[in-house]
Regions:
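Short acidic/polar capping segments at secondary-structure boundaries
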Residues: 11, 109-110, 147-150
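Short, well-ordered secondary-structure micro-motifs
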Residues: 56, 114-117, 155
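Histidine/lysine/aspartate-rich catalytic loop segments that bind and position anionic ligands
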Residues: 96-137
Length: 174
């Protein structure tokens, strides 16, 4: 079974939300993500889903990426992908949430700020169920694309490599 994973393909990581965490041309990955999904049997969506009371929040971008001292929210970040905001939304042109075969919402708990899609916590003790679901699907290949490469895509790929006996392909849309 081949599974395609859209990692955090949300407006928060695009120029559409310039005050959040925009990735240059991030909004242009939709066509590539849809092409990768066409090669797969199943499709997974991951989404950052943050709370306004998150303990890692800072108001000023100058204060970002500083250690927090918390084990499951290691760095400070400006508000992004807050549930109910434009940044939380999937990119236009992607399927609706109900059209995906499996969904992972990350960072819902204000105490946690995970990067990868396989665990709710940085210490990798609280599974999101993704690895287990992939095993139940008899997955032999995973194609990963999304935003942003340096944190969420990278961590998801590393977790997938440790978590199963499948090939992991990183798409250029990452």
């Amino acid at each position: 079974m081949i599974v395609s994973i859209d990692v955090d393909a949300q407006k928060t990581f695009t120029p559409l939300c310039p005050d959040e965490l925009p990735v240059n041309e991030g909004h242009l990955i939709v066509e590539e993500l849809n092409a990768q999904a066409a090669l797969a049997d199943l499709r997974v969506m991951t989404k950052d889903a943050h709370h306004m009371a998150a303990k890692w929040l800072v108001d000023n971008p100058v204060d970002m990426l500083k250690p927090t001292g918390f084990s499951d929210a290691d760095l400070t970040w400006v508000a992004h992908a807050m549930v109910g905001t434009r940044g939380y939304e999937l990119l236009d042109g992607l399927p609706s949430v109900k059209e995906y075969d499996y969904c992972v919402w990350k960072g819902v708990d204000p105490e946690l700020h995970p990067y990868g899609a396989c665990f709710h916590d940085i210490e990798e003790k609280l599974s999101t169920g993704l690895i287990e679901w992939l095993r139940c699907q008899n997955t032999n290949m995973v194609i990963v694309g999304g935003l942003a490469t340096d944190y969420c895509v990278k961590t998801t790929v590393l977790q997938l490599l440790k978590g199963g006996r499948w090939q992991v392909i990183v798409n250029e849309a990452a």
